[in-house]
Amino acid sequence: MRTGVRALTTVAAAAIALALPTPAAQAGYLDELAVAHRGATTSTIAEGTMASYRYAVRHHADILDGDVRWAKDGADADSVGAMVISHDATLNRVTNCSGYLSNWLWSSIYKKCRTEVGGQRLIRLVDLLKYGKSVGKPFAIEIKASYITNAQARQLWYAINGYKVQLEAGYSALPSLNKIKKLDAADPNHKISYARITSGGGGWPSVATLKKTGTSVHANKSIPASVMRSYKAGGLKVYLFTGKNETDYARMAALRPYAVVVDDVGRFQRWRDAQS
């Protein structure tokens, strides 16, 4: 793995900056960190599975990225409903099951649902956290739900509080993220950091607006160079998403971000190594 660029599986923020790998000087063409998006998405590995995260770690991912949603409350051990790693609200695209994840018990998902690619089980947030900690990786976790109950907020906060986590949200999910921040503010020993996600739709948020959430921002790779410069000048750590191929990698690296979010860390590493 090259010194200048390492692969992350999500974003690390100011509160845990000292505990995370950092780019050499944030000046060179390839000095960005790389975030492994949902673990990995390849022709043989499905996103959000344990296989995808193991693949990311084998290819030197620095941060493990995932999205969290809640399964149905029921007879499972967790009375609030298990927190499942899933980008989609439904099981349709990734697995052989269908319907909203929130309508399924975790026990049923575990027994019945397998990914269309690779035939793997989905995993819970607690499974990802346990694995990541065992291999020394921090996390970037996105809240997808625009509304969560107070019980769900407490459940999520207790789950991630002992780990190096950057919690992220787009504009619609900020109310959910802010519930976590409120709980977190009362803990003097917290390790959680926070980041806003933006695709630039409706305009790029100002530095001041973004800093209301945290000192990091996840921005779509379509971000204009002028906006990128203003974010960096304003003290924001910019993570660009999502790199799917070599053309994307080159564009993202040219903007000299703090980190890049990529679907296939192995492919990104091969491209990066070929630049020398």
Predicted features along the sequence, with ranges:
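Phosphate-group recognition and catalysis centered on beta-loop-alpha active-site segments
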Residues: 2-10, 17-276
